[in-house]
Regions:
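Residue-level marker of intrinsically disordered, low-complexity segments enriched
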Residues: 3, 11-14, 110-112, 121, ...
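Conserved NAD+-utilizing ADP-ribose enzyme module
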Residues: 1-106, 153-159, 167-259
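Short, extreme N-terminal leader segments that mark the start of a protein/domain
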Residues: 90-136
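A glycine-rich, hydrophobic loop/mini-helix early in the fold
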Residues: 121-163, 167-169
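Hydrophobic side chains in beta-strands
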Residues: 114-116, 163-165, 197
Length: 259
């Protein structure tokens, strides 16, 4: 069910039901302040994506991807936007979907996924990337809370393989190793592997999903024919410990040199 409101306060109380939120709710907010996009759970509110309409040129696609993706999950959705904005977004989005098989002009041609040294060995052995929940089901890892739970990520995030550019993936690896959300891009950590994958092929084969802010794949993604390059500390000339900033820069440089 979709609910549109003009005003919204992030709090533990759902303005639609008057009760506390449960996992069946998700919120998308158009704002005029802050960063381009911020996601997570704030002040006890449901998982939310806040999108700054003034600097996010793709806000209409982001909004409608969020609606499409979460509707398929059976979620109740709160959209904080004007009626005109919602109508405009739907007109722009007509003919599109969160699982469409063609890359959009705003989407990257290369997807990046970062992993720990231990997980990279497992990935090479099985020849595929697998979601956390798939690995738990196969007995490959012990069930424990993912690091994203500290940010308010919904439980179903563990059904997906997530991608992110820049230093984001290395921050996730570093945070896992440190046991807390460590946003310091210069903090020492042990790099694993930084994988570069062909986004157009992944989309064309029906794997790519869009949730309003992330690009991701559900359950399993074979390495072949999508993996373009795998960077490790050794392959980019880093000995021992590194930092998210150092490793991501060196890995990107190595990948760019073979393109």
């Amino acid at each position: 069910m979709l609910y549109r409101v003009n005003r919204f306060t992030e709090s533990p109380i759902n303005p639609i039901t008057g009760d506390k939120y449960d996992d069946s709710w998700a919120v998308f907010m158009l704002t005029d302040r802050g960063e381009k996009q911020v996601c997570g759970s704030f002040n006890g509110c449901a998982y939310s994506i806040k999108t700054n309409r003034s600097i996010c040129a793709e806000w209409a696609f982001s909004l409608c991807d969020f609606i499409d993706f979460n509707s398929r999950l059976g979620k109740n959705i709160i959209v904080v936007a004007t009626a005109d904005e919602l109508e405009t977004a739907r007109k722009i989005y007509r003919g599109h979907g969160c699982d469409e098989r063609t890359l959009r002009s705003s989407e990257p041609a290369v997807l990046v996924h970062s992993t720990t040294p231990e997980n990279w060995q497992r990935i090479k052995q099985c020849g595929a990337l697998k979601s956390r929940n798939r690995l738990i089901a196969e007995g490959c890892i012990v069930e424990e809370k993912p690091i994203g739970a500290l940010l308010g990520d919904p439980a179903e995030f563990s059904d997906y393989i997530m991608f992110g550019g820049g230093v984001t993936g290395e921050i996730v690896v570093s945070s896992r190793q440190h046991g807390f959300i460590d946003m310091d891009i210069n903090a020492p950590y042990r790099p694993g592997a930084r994988l570069y994958l062909d986004a157009a092929k992944i989309a064309a084969d029906g794997f790519l999903l869009r949730d309003g802010t992330h690009l991701k794949v559900k359950n399993v993604l074979p390495l072949k024919p999508y993996l373009l390059f795998a960077a490790t500390a050794e392959s980019v000339g880093i000995c021992g410990a590194s930092t998210p900033a150092e490793f991501s820069k060196a890995a990107d440089k190595a990948f760019d040199s073979i393109r």
